[in-house]
Curated annotation (Swiss-Prot):
PROSITE patterns per the UniProt record, alphabetical: NIR_SIR
The protein's name: Sulfite reductase [NADPH] hemoprotein beta-component
Gene Ontology molecular function: 4 iron, 4 sulfur cluster binding; heme binding; metal ion binding; NADP binding; sulfite reductase (ferredoxin) activity; sulfite reductase (NADPH) activity
Positions contributing to [4Fe-4S] cluster binding: 442, 448, 487, 491
Gene3D superfamilies for this protein: 3.90.480.20, Sulfite Reductase Hemoprotein, domain 1
GO biological process: cysteine biosynthetic process; hydrogen sulfide biosynthetic process; sulfate assimilation
NCBIfam families: CysI, PRK13504.1
Catalytic activity of the protein: hydrogen sulfide + 3 NADP(+) + 3 H2O = sulfite + 3 NADPH + 4 H(+)
Statement: the UniProt record of this protein carries the keyword 4Fe-4S: yes
Length: 588
């Protein structure tokens, strides 16, 4: 570790958070989880294990719709687990999907599969007694849930660009390599969930599981990584702790990456020491130094990230404490090379190409719109059965996108008609507005314990109301990137939307506006603690002006800033909470 006198280590003067004690005492993430699995008196986990299961890709939840009713009956909340699979780049094979579908139908409370905006799937409502069978199933089909939550590098995103097939494959391979390189070395996951063996702590174990990159207490906080291929910013590359922007050479081949750090969208209502942020550029690295750069950033965050205050522990706060130049210098010291100047690139859009597109390899790719990523069977839309039927005949692969949609990828010309017929039969191909196509929400109620307001369950009707507003003002064919998140933790990425709703209380939200279409700008708070109907009324007035006063092709988010309806967020750590503190500079 570097000299502790270096700027950025002031937090060491304060007591460590209890999570640091928990990790130290966990026997490399094993804890006493095996003992808890045998306890049939509760559906949940006790003590440290409640937190430790997160390192294995799970969260303990309960059904909040019936929580009060159960407490009234002197019953504990109906506890179960959320499981998040590790799936770098979101690619999954049809045979894997068939098994994933079967488990969801037979063993989860909600009998659904949730596609996430981090390009993976989640199970909701897995009972404790089915956890080991679930992990063994995943292991048997080449999958796992290692490090998809808690203080580690989480699922690595990669642009889903089926048209540029060769470049996408190259970038995807690096996304996989980064994911594997930054995984914990501990066998704790396999010992607990696959082998079911109790391993006592010993000196030999410490030598085997030294964790040369993550360290024995892993990272100070969650850590998110993405790989993007311009001009498509579908992964919201500015929202992650570590980002790789693919750069092509003159022959169209991948030659290296621009490396960006310090993005993140979570904050806390009323806590001005917290803020969402867009990532900063460190510079360019050629392909052969990609993993060294990833490791250098992780080690710098490991050593300098705040282990006292978890609310200020993400990379953006480490950079604020060290300065960007100081952070860059430490990363360069770790990887023993210097960053080259950032190479030119441009992002122009974020949305998925819904429908059929043809790749340069002449294969076809069908992107299916899945509202909020929820794959389930309803009488009018048996989507879950539809995807299962596709998996039974599809010869290519599936790709989960960072917009919560599903690509049926690598379809041969002769198979295209069959794939389309199945998709149409089960309602997987539908006519939707541009507004709905680009909308997103987190899960929120009833399963998320942090949710302050609804998100996924109110999004469909809310978008229908906004569709009426756009039609009223003759801009129904336009797109405004709209997102709802049930709390300020930011899982719905509302802090990179043109219209972002952040849950404040049941039925009430903070309304942020002024993000941009390419995902480069944080939206600012416009109205606080208002209802969905009040938000619709506010948007009605703003869209009326946008429809008549905008410049040619001017996006809604750009219009509200140019028209001085709202001030831009320029430097989030300075002016996110107070627009009067804006320092004139280039708007990010």
């Amino acid at each position: 570790m570097s000299d502790k006198k270096i700027k950025g280590l002031e937090w060491q003067e304060k007591p460590l958070s209890d999570n640091e004690r928990l990790k130290t005492d966990s026997n490399f993430l094993r804890g006493t989880i095996l003992e808890d699995l045998k306890d049939g008196l509760t559906g949940g986990f006790k003590g440290d294990n409640f937190q430790l299961i997160r390192f294995h890709g799970m969260y303990e939840q309960d059904d909040r719709d019936i929580r009060a009713e159960r407490l009234e009956e002197k019953l504990e909340p109906l506890k179960f687990m959320l499981l998040r699979c590790r799936l770098p780049g979101g690619i999954i094979k049809p045979y894997q999907w068939i098994e994933i579908d079967k488990f969801a139908r037979e063993h989860t409370r909600y009998q659904s599969i949730r596609l996430t905006n981090r390009q993976t799937f989640q199970y909701h409502g897995v009972p404790k007694g089915k956890l080991q069978p679930m992990h063994r199933l995943l292991h048997s089909i080449g999958l796992d849930s290692i490090a998809t939550a808690a203080d580690m590098n989480r699922n690595v995103l990669c642009t889903s660009n089926p048209i540029e097939s060769e470049l996408h494959q190259q970038a995807y391979e690096f996304a996989k390599k980064i994911s594997e390189h930054l995984l914990p070395r501990s066998r704790g996951y396999l010992d607990v969930w696959v082998d079911g063996k109790k391993i006592e702590s010993s000196d030999d174990l410490l030598k085997i599981e030294d964790e040369p990159i993550l360290g024995k207490t892993f990272l100070p906080r969650k850590f998110k990584t993405a790989v993007a291929i311009p001009p498509l910013n579908d992964v919201d590359v500015y929202a992650n702790d570590l980002n790789f922007i693919a750069i092509q050479d003159d022959n169209g081949q991948l030659c290296g990456f621009n490396v960006l750090v310090g993005g993140g969208l979570s904050f806390e209502h009323g806590n001005t020491k917290t803020y969402p942020n867009v990532a900063y550029s460190l510079g360019f690295v050629p392909l052969e130094h990609t993993l060294a750069a990833a490791e250098g950033v992780v080690k710098t965050q490991r050593d300098f990230g705040n282990r006292s205050d978890r609310k200020n522990a993400r990379v953006r706060y480490t950079i604020q404490n060290m300065t960007l130049d100081g952070f860059r210098a430490e990363v360069e010291r770790c990887m023993n090379i210097k960053f080259e100047p950032t190479r030119p690139y441009e992002f122009t859009e974020r949305g998925d190409r819904i429908g059929w597109v043809k790749g340069i390899d002449n294969n076809w790719h069908l992107t299916l719109f899945i509202e909020s990523g929820r794959i389930t069977d309803k009488p009018e839309k048996p989507l879950m059965t539809g995807v299962l039927e596709l998996a039974k005949v599809h010869k290519g692969d599936f790709r989960i996108t960072a917009n919560q949609n599903l690509i049926v990828a690598n379809v041969a010309e002769q198979d295209k008609a069959q794939i389309e017929a199945i998709a149409r039969q089960y309602g997987l191909i539908q006519e939707i507005s541009k507004l709905r196509e680009n909308a997103m929400s987190c899960v929120s109620l009833p399963t998320c314990p942090l949710a302050m307001a609804e998100a996924e369950r109110v999004l469909p009707d809310f978008i229908s109301e906004l569709d009426k507003v756009l039609s009223k003002h003759n801009v129904a064919d336009e797109s405004i990137i709209t997102r709802i998140t049930g709390c300020p933790n930011g899982c719905g990425r509302a802090m990179l939307a043109e219209i972002g709703l952040v849950g404040k209380a049941i039925g009430r939200y903070n309304l942020h506006i002024g993000g941009d279409r390419a995902g480069l700008r944080i939206p600012r708070l416009y109205k606080e603690n208002i209802t969905l109907q009040e938000i619709v009324n506010e948007i009605d007035q703003l869209v009326a002006r946008w429809a008549t006063e905008r410049q040619t092709n001017e996006a809604f988010g750009d219009f509200v800033i140019r028209s001085n309806i709202i001030a831009p967020v320029v430097n989030a750590h300075i002016d996110f909470w107070d627009a009067t503190k804006i320092i004139p500079t280039t708007i990010i």
